[in-house]
Swiss-Prot record:
Listed GO CC annotations: extracellular space
Gene this protein is translated from: LysP
Entry protein name: Lysozyme P
BP GO terms, sorted: defense response to Gram-negative bacterium; killing of cells of another organism
Domain C-type lysozyme: 20-141
Top-tier EC class: hydrolase
Similarity section: Belongs to the glycosyl hydrolase 22 family.
UniProt note on tissues of expression: Salivary gland.
Species of provenance: Drosophila melanogaster
Amino acid sequence: MKAFLVICALTLTAVATQARTMDRCSLAREMSKLGVPRDQLAKWTCIAQHESSFRTGVVGPANSNGSNDYGIFQINNKYWCKPADGRFSYNECGLSCNALLTDDITNSVKCARKIQRQQGWTAWSTWKYCSGSLPSINSCF
């Protein structure tokens, strides 16, 4: 049991050292470089703010179905990514959940865009905070 706890602690430490906290403009600029249309950036930055406070290394608490949400966009491990503990996942994005926790947001952006294309903005419970008028991101560029 002690060995298991040590391994878990080391894994979390390794993931945490690769994570970072972004801000609205750094996220908007990186997402733009990754091909996200500029007219969507205010929505994405709002979602990231409300889901993770712009932190890439966040693993949310267990949901009512036992699943967890990962990364800057809090992507669910039952449907979109493969949890490290081997639990069943549909893994629609074809990646490990730990790939959503690093300072490189490429995987998170690709997966989040897939979710948005399939389910729309309401896939995020925080969308209610982002569906109205949002501050412009023009000053970020």
